[in-house]
Amino acid sequence: MIAFRFPVKTLTATRLFAEHIAQAYPTQKAILFGSRARRSEHDEGDADVAIILKGAIGPFIKTKMAMNDITYDILLDTGIRIQPLPVWEAEWAHPQNYSNPYLLYDIARDGIDLASRFNEF
């Protein structure tokens, strides 16, 4: 894979998001996926971030909506819209049991662990 530097706004927004999520949820990791991870994003495109959560599988919609509340403040601060995807560690470990296993396969293949990129600041 060719190394590249993320745009500062993307790093700022995803770092803020990951920090806020880690304060609210037991988080294993945050993974950027989709167009920003593939470097094919548009100026107005969102940043898709999978949040791998520790513990028992919880209520998806309730968790996603709570994460969306956090993303709104980050949008106002950075101009970057984040689309969170909560995934529990059991789902991540066994994607074949997830409602959309191919999405998790794609994230595992193309996604970028954000913790490894935050040192670019």
Each language-model region and where it sits:
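Catalytic core of pol beta-like nucleotidyltransferases
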Residues: 1-29, 38-40, 54-121
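Glycine-rich beta-strand-to-loop/alpha-helix junction loops that act as flexible
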Residues: 33-35
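Short beta-strand->loop micro-motif that forms the acidic, two-metal-ion catalytic signature
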Residues: 47-52
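Short glycine/proline-enriched turns and hinge-like loops at secondary-structure junctions
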Residues: 42-45
